Regions:
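Active-site-adjacent "subsite" loops/lids of carbohydrate-active enzymes
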Residues: 52-67, 71, 132, 148-201
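Active-site-proximal loop/short-helix segments
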Residues: 107, 151-159, 202-233
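Substrate-binding cleft of secreted/luminal carbohydrate-active enzymes
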Residues: 284-297, 307-400
């Protein structure tokens, strides 16, 4: 990931209290970054404060995903403890989840208007303490912001939702009964950009956008209408929106990164979701394919049971990714997501996790992030902090044990 200055420049566009926040967002010119309410209208517990130095980007990012529930609870401090004692140097924290809710109280007008910051927001003092602690221990904070899968915004602002072809005044619903936003709508991406800008203002060192795609249901193309498509291919739409969003955020000087389906490294189509490797790999500073072996069909890479061969899947998949990136000028850095959860046989443990990591190392890809939807990780798979770097995991020093607390009362986020 590209390095960024120790201090950041935050461009603020102040709008009048009487102006419509949604209308103002639509009127902003490309290149303008944040839109916030005047100070007189901001809650007293606002998190924004004078700029502080951001944690610099590690040469090799080794991270864990922290879901919203984990961030709100005791698990946040446990995961910070993991990062202090192991090779983990980064935490990807849900700033906006796939229900549309924010982690903390926001100054972004649209977020306030739709109540995106009203569902159990993190207390101001706690959010500051989390980011200050991470900064003190040089732990790299990454803000994960879900873009197109936002049922809250789709319900509150129907104009931006995907519509049914038979009833254009009604939103299209996925198999779980949830509406999605239309990727053609610029406002969808401007909203994400505003949230990203705010997150950097709080102290996050990187912006990571997820669900930068169309829904992955084939019936969508029979049941939905896209009046703004204007003949463009889905992959072209996603590319154009990523490039615009990247430009809006460029003044912040932080890495612009995107999560993509793991199968994009091998599939030469857009898979119906608008994600084609050559179309997006140069539209971000970093691309993060979700390389979960359990998500590969039997026979992929001539492997009968991909889930049982994590090294081979990652090795072959990242070889494809590197090869395809070589043909694209200014291709983004590849940072794969690896699987730290069990879906089918075998049960995933330290050996399976290290096998994935070794598959990356053998391709010269030293960065990685582990995904577990509950943010419960296999600590025994991690090297102790300060252990010698090596692609050979046989000499790995075991990490100090960290007691994990199961929290069954907290609903896990759905698998991606």
């Amino acid at each position: 990931m590209p390095a960024h200055p120790a201090t950041w420049a935050l461009a603020l566009v102040i709008i009048s209290a009487a102006a419509s926040s949604q209308g103002a967002s639509q009127m902003r010119a490309a290149g303008e970054v944040c839109s916030i309410l005047p100070d007189s209208a901001v809650a007293k517990d606002s998190l924004l404060r004078p700029p502080a130095p951001l944690v610099p980007t590690p040469e090799a990012v080794r991270g864990l995903y922290v879901n919203r529930w984990a961030a709100l609870g005791r698990k946040m401090w446990l995961l910070i403890g993991v990062a202090r004692t192991t090779e983990i140097n980064s935490l990807v924290i849900d700033v906006k989840d796939d229900r549309g809710y924010l982690l903390y109280k926001s100054r972004v007008p649209l977020a306030r208007a739709i109540g995106a910051d009203t569902f159990m927001p993190m207390r101001t003092e706690r959010m500051r303490a989390v980011l200050d602690t991470m900064r003190a221990h040089n732990i790299y904070p990454i803000a994960r912001i879900v873009v197109v899968k936002d049922p809250l915004l789709a319900e509150r602002k129907l104009d931006w939702a995907i519509k049914r072809v038979d009833k254009p005044d009604k939103p299209w619903l996925d198999k779980n009964g949830s509406p999605w936003l239309d990727p053609h709508q610029d406002g969808v991406w401007r909203y994400a950009a505003d949230l990203a800008c705010e997150a950097v203002g709080l102290g996050f060192s990187e912006v990571q956008l997820d669900y930068v795609r169309f829904p992955d249901e084939s019936r969508l193309w029979r049941e939905a209408t896209f009046p703004l498509a204007a003949g463009r291919l889905r992959a072209q739409v996603i590319r154009e929106q990523l490039l615009k969003t990247r430009e809006w955020l460029r003044p912040l000087g932080v890495p612009f990164t995107i999560d993509v389906f793991g199968l994009t490294v091998a599939d030469t189509t857009d898979m119906g979701i608008g994600q084609k490797w050559e179309s997006f790999v140069d539209a971000a500073d970093v691309v993060l394919p979700m390389m979960y072996p359990s998500h590969y069909a039997p026979g992929s890479y001539h492997i009968a049971r991909p889930n049982a061969h994590p090294y081979d899947v990652i090795d072959k998949g990242l070889e494809d990714a590197r090869h395809r990136s070589q043909g694209v000028p200014n291709a983004g850095k590849i940072v794969p997501w690896y699987q730290d959860f069990t879906l089918g046989k075998p049960r995933y443990g330290a050996a399976e996790i290290r096998a994935q990591i070794r598959g990356g190392y053998d391709n010269g890809i030293m960065s990685w992030i582990l995904w577990n939807p509950r943010s419960v990780y296999t600590i025994s798979a991690l090297r102790a902090r300060g252990a010698l770097e090596s692609g050979d995991t046989s000499a790995t020093s075991p990490a100090p044990s960290v007691r994990r607390r199961r929290e069954p009362s907290q609903p896990p986020p759905p698998a991606r």
